[in-house]
């Protein structure tokens, strides 16, 4: 008669398989290519909850890794064995050895198993302050996953063989609350049978005509249309507004971008109106903002620029990828704009070889923002999303914001940047940019495995340092960037004089003797770079005057364009709030202890009752 209370209490213990947790998971993604491993997640204050649904009757593994490999990873393993759920917190050391974590920070909420699938739901704190756990921030996380047909035993989980993988995600991207109709009209801007050359990098440009609208419409969602099997080939897509002074003859055929023989019409396409990069999904504008079409100020012709990345020089590739734009006649309050901020893509952007860390900065200067905003919108513009962009050497990007010498909260950041995963970050709160503010796109690179200089450029082996700001209301400012002074960079390696007038590119060194008649690129590569020299060079570059780029639509420029400016004096750097360690571990232990104590008391009560009979 005393056994039934124990069974009831067992159903109350954490990890019971009695039923679902009742939680909702607004974010969901497939981790494998066969539809076997689904991940759902949801942030709740200082905690994050996960739901794993996997086609297996054995254990399920999940975790976070600094590189996507098993070394130095934060791992949790769970399942249902003999009708009883389990969940264990593990970690791996630098040698990929799996060890049980002394501080168990993952807490089982629900587990279920049937003949084909296992479902596990669990929570953890964003910041556990356990050295073996990965803190979860707004940055990219490299999720690792695995499963096995057998459950984990007392000795730990068996090796998962090929049932494993990795995927980069941003777990704390704010939820998109607006629900869009599935019947929205759309049009496609998609390349037709583009032959991809057998070289590592190709930029392909094709002009399109926007459908003719008799009245104003708003684009409210943009999705990538990537040809199946080309997910790693198509690295990023930019959509530019072109001059409206054309006829349809410009639509006849595409051409390789930035090529001497490309059509002159392409040169009028300077205003970025949308950007997508590898790993990103569709983008929905906020409920009060849309991309305007149908008015005289809106694009009639656009240029689709697709960056193809073919590092294996594969031959015979034909691509049909592009963008799909969903639109509505239900006009929203504001028109969206895009500002490209950061380092102007140029050979003057230099990164020495062999550097475990090197920092570059691109300045959207107060002079440019002062002139453009005072003329267009003195009350300021409101940023609601940011795309951070770099290439293979990129390790971290931050978009910093300054006002009158004071550093504001970061507009956007990704301290674990992944070249293969770049998407717009929705800001948790819209941020206002005022006349006279400064923006700095700060990029961190690693060139330890490179023997020669890395230059700013279009190739994925070259580098970029850019931020694309989505904002409203739209103003006539499309690019706010900078170029560092090259002569002072060359003086660092001992260059004294170049041949003038400059008639070749890259230009040629005249003196000293060791660099005579070398291009400035060859001279920089000839210099004997050490880590110490690289650090000194980095300090110099960050202090150099910059050439201002401040562009309007239709290749027009603000008057500040081409002038020289100094990096801002930062009187009051931003102090981020310290991370607060979660308490779920202690509260869970207290809860478990209380329930176990109650179980013991009931057992004792049953025993005494039996003896008294």
From Swiss-Prot:
Keyword terms of this UniProt record: Copper, Disulfide bond, Endoplasmic reticulum, Glycoprotein, Membrane, Metal-binding, Monooxygenase, Oxidoreductase, Signal, Transmembrane, Transmembrane helix
Instruction: Write down the InterPro entries for this protein, in alphabetical order.
Output: Cu2_ascorb_mOase-like_C, Cu2_ascorb_mOase_N, Cu2_ascorb_mOase_N_sf, Cu2_monoox_C, DBH-like, DOH_DOMON, DOMON_domain, PHM/PNGase_F_dom_sf
User: How would you classify this enzyme at the top EC level?
Assistant: oxidoreductase
| Cell location | Endoplasmic reticulum membrane
Residue ranges of domain DOMON in the record: 35-148
Gene Ontology cellular component terms for the protein in this record? endoplasmic reticulum membrane; extracellular space; secretory granule membrane
**Active site: which residues?**
203, 389
* Protein name (database record): DBH-like monooxygenase protein 1
Q: What organism is listed for this UniProt entry?
A: Homo sapiens (Human)
């Amino acid at each position: 008669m005393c056994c039934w209370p124990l069974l009831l209490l067992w159903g109350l213990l954490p990890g019971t398989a009695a039923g679902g947790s009742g939680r909702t998971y607004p974010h969901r993604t497939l981790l494998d290519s066969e539809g076997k491993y689904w991940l759902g997640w949801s942030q709740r204050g200082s905690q994050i909850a996960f739901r794993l649904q996997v086609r297996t009757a054995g254990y399920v593994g999940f975790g976070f890794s600094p590189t996507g490999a098993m070394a130095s990873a934060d791992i949790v393993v769970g399942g249902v064995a003999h009708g009883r759920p389990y969940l264990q917190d593990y970690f791996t050391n630098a040698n990929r050895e799996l060890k049980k974590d002394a501080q168990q920070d993952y807490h089982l909420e629900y587990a279920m198993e049937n003949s084909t699938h296992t479902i596990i739901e669990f929570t953890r704190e964003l910041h556990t302050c356990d050295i073996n756990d990965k803190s979860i921030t707004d940055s990219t996380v490299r999720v690792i996953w695995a499963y096995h047909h057998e459950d984990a035993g007392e000795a730990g989980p068996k090796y998962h063989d090929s049932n494993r993988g990795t995927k980069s995600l941003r777990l704390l991207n704010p939820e998109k609350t607006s629900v869009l109709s599935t019947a929205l009209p759309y049009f496609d801007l998609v390349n037709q049978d583009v032959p991809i050359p057998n070289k590592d990098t190709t930029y392909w440009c094709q002009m399109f005509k926007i459908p003719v609208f008799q009245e104003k419409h708003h684009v409210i969602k943009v999705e990538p249309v990537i040809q199946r099997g080309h997910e790693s080939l198509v690295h990023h897509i930019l959509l530019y507004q072109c001059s409206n002074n054309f006829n349809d003859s410009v639509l006849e055929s595409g051409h390789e971008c930035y090529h001497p023989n490309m059509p002159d019409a392409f040169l009028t396409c300077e205003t970025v109106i949308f950007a997508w990069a590898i790993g990103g999904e569709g983008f929905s504008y906020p409920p009060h903002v849309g991309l305007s079409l149908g008015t005289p100020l809106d694009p009639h012709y656009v240029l689709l620029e697709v960056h193809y990345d073919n590092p294996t020089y594969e031959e015979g590739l034909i691509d049909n990828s592009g963008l799909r734009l969903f639109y509505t006649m239900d006009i929203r309050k504001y028109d969206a704009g895009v500002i490209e901020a950061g380092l102007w893509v140029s050979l003057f952007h230099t990164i020495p070889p062999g550097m475990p860390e090197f920092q570059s900065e691109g300045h959207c200067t107060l002079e440019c923002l002062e002139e453009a905003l005072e003329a267009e919108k003195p009350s300021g513009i409101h940023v609601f999303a940011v795309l951070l962009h770099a290439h293979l050497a990129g390790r971290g990007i931050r978009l910093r914001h300054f006002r009158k010498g004071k550093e504001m909260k970061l507009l956007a950041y990704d301290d674990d940047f992944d070249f293969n995963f770049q998407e717009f970050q929705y800001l948790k709160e819209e941020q206002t940019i005022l006349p006279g503010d400064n923006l700095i796109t700060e990029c961190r690179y690693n060139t330890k495995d490179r023997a020669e200089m890395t230059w700013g450029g279009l190739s994925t082996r070259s580098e970029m340092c850019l931020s694309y700001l989505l904002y409203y209301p739209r103003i006539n400012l499309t690019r706010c960037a900078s170029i560092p002074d090259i002569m002072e960079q060359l003086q660092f390696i001992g260059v004294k004089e170049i041949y003038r007038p400059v008639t070749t590119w890259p230009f040629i060194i005249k003196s000293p003797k060791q660099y005579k008649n070398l291009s400035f690129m060859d001279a920089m590569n000839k210099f004997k770079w050490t880590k110490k020299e690289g650090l000194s060079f980095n300090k110099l570059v960050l202090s150099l005057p910059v050439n201002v780029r401040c562009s309007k639509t239709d290749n027009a420029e603000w008057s500040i364009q081409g002038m020289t400016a100094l990096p801002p004096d930062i009187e009051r750097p931003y102090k981020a709030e310290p991370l607060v360690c979660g308490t779920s571990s202690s509260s869970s232990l207290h809860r478990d202890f209380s329930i176990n104590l109650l179980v013991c008391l009931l057992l004792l009560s049953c025993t005494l009752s039996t003896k008294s009979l």
